[in-house]
Amino acid sequence: KVTRAHTEAVQRCERIGFDAIELHGAHGYLVSSFLSPLANRREDEYGGDIINRMRYPLELFTKMRDAWPDKKPMGVRFNGTDWDDQGLTTEDAITFGKALKDVGCDFFDISGGGNSMARPQVGPGYQAHLAKAVKHATNIPTMAVGMIRDPRLAEKLIADGSCDMIALARGLLYEPRWP
């Protein structure tokens, strides 16, 4: 039922003219909850090691990708870490990224957290190193997020190879005329 709802949403996006779509798989939502050992305590083929934990997210993405035109990009936002020693690691994220690449993912949007009460040290660009690690391990265009409110920082992160794109949300709320 959940997979069908996602594929129907993809079909609606195509019908109304979206140019690209992104599956939100971070911050404790469904995909993130499967990937994280903090949330996924299953003892069947969908739990345990990262290969099993990423099984449903890959099944879901594949069905969504099949419903989306090949010529249009489709990406996934996922955690590069849970910010918890017992949680999803950056190596797990890289493993997931490589598997997504194999099933036709066009870009990644790398974030972190949501499955634990951990409070990481935050500051401008604090998650960019996660995007860089996944980008360099997978060779897939990757987006960085996390308090990137200054256009000079955004340019620096792209120029130094940390990412290919910057995701902006609050930055545009703070400064709607962001250059």
Model-derived features: positions:
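Flavin-dependent oxidoreductase catalytic cores
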Residues: 1-179
